[in-house]
Amino acid sequence: MATTDVTVVVKIGTSSLTDTQTGLLRLSVLGPLVEVLTHLRRQGYAVILVSSGAVGVGCARLGWRQRPTAIAEKQAVAAVGQGRLIRLYDDLFSALNQPIAQVLLTRGDLVERSRYVNANRTFAQLLQMGVIPIVNENDTVAVEELKFGDNDSLSALVASMVQAKWLILLTDVDKLYSADPNRDPSAQPIERVLPGIPLQVKAEAQGKSGWGTGGMATKLTAAQIATAAGVTVVITNGKRPEQIPAILAGEAIGTRFDPAPQPASARKRWIAYGLIPEGSLTLDEGAVRAVCEQGRSLLPAGITAISGEFEAGAAVRLCDPSGQEVARGLVNYSAEELRQIKGKKTAEIPRILGYEGVDTAVHRDNLALLN
């Protein structure tokens, strides 16, 4: 049984798990990782492992030298690899008498509120039982529009869901740099990132391996999601899993992202990062100030443009005049209705729409600001 409230989510990527040339699993990494996570569990930490590698393992099993690009092939190869991957984890953890559970998620499990809550309850029960859940995206059934796209985002959403204290992103570099150190000799290491301080990095240039789907840009997105939920995030070298206890003890290893001082509520986090926006609203400067600085609801008068087609209750992006996304929210009107009442005063809504609508386009209770 768990003896502490501290939950640690560890994500290991394909580039750390597998050989970049052959796609074969690196047992020299997996073995120490399993030992470290088991040790943490016995110390009283609640531990969740988010593991990539199913496609890479599947390719190796089939003798493929390159990662497939066709969706059907990727899903089939993932089905081949996931079974072998979880079997290996079970063998390694069983040798240390540590029970594990396989948890395969799709984006749809987090989009629908009832499924989100149920997934959270399942994690809570597993952790209470002293089990280490091993999480991966269910690539075999996930449709392209509802994919996480990378396990960095998945790990951050899981950390947010279970209200973890730590998210450790194990990758193929020691830490975050201002640019790709392999290409730019002036690249500077970044030791710590504080909330609210702009981060100047060339994340897109810090690439990914041929077997993975992530990169440094996806890890920054993951850090944004997790820190908004009050989670401390660390990016560090996946080939050194033995450093994880030292990180939890406060040693300056890798790049640390400090959590937001006032984490958003679970519902606001679900709106901001769990849902998939179906459109966007462009706001004028006054509406941006009202929403972002004064914590007010969005009125139709502050909307200058609508993009996309959606119904009332859909999730949408809220953008400033330059197109920068500043918030997400659940709309009270459809896209067609909003096009009729954008820029109009609240008192004019009944005359324009022909019925007594609500005053707000997005109520502040259904609106979540982004970092």
UniProtKB/Swiss-Prot annotation:
Function: Catalyzes the transfer of a phosphate group to glutamate to form L-glutamate 5-phosphate.
Family in the record: Belongs to the glutamate 5-kinase family.
Source organism superkingdom: Bacteria
Protein name: Glutamate 5-kinase
Keyword annotations: Amino-acid biosynthesis, ATP-binding, Cytoplasm, Kinase, Nucleotide-binding, Proline biosynthesis, Transferase
Major enzyme class: transferase
SMART domains: PUA
Enzyme nomenclature, EC number: 2.7.2.11
Residues noted as binding ATP in the record, renumbered to the chain: 11, 171-172, 213-219
Any single GO CC term annotated in Swiss-Prot or TrEMBL for this entry: cytosol
Annotated ranges, domain PUA: 278-356
CDD domains linked: AAK_G5K_ProB, PUA_G5K
Compartments where located: Cytoplasm
Any GO MF annotation of the entry: RNA binding
Membrane-spanning residues: none
Pfam families: AA_kinase (PF00696), PUA (PF01472)
Catalysed reactions listed for this entry: L-glutamate + ATP = L-glutamyl 5-phosphate + ADP
UniProt: substrate binding residues: 52, 139, 151
Pathway: Amino-acid biosynthesis; L-proline biosynthesis; L-glutamate 5-semialdehyde from L-glutamate: step 1/2
GO BP of this protein: L-proline biosynthetic process
Gene symbol of the encoding locus: proB
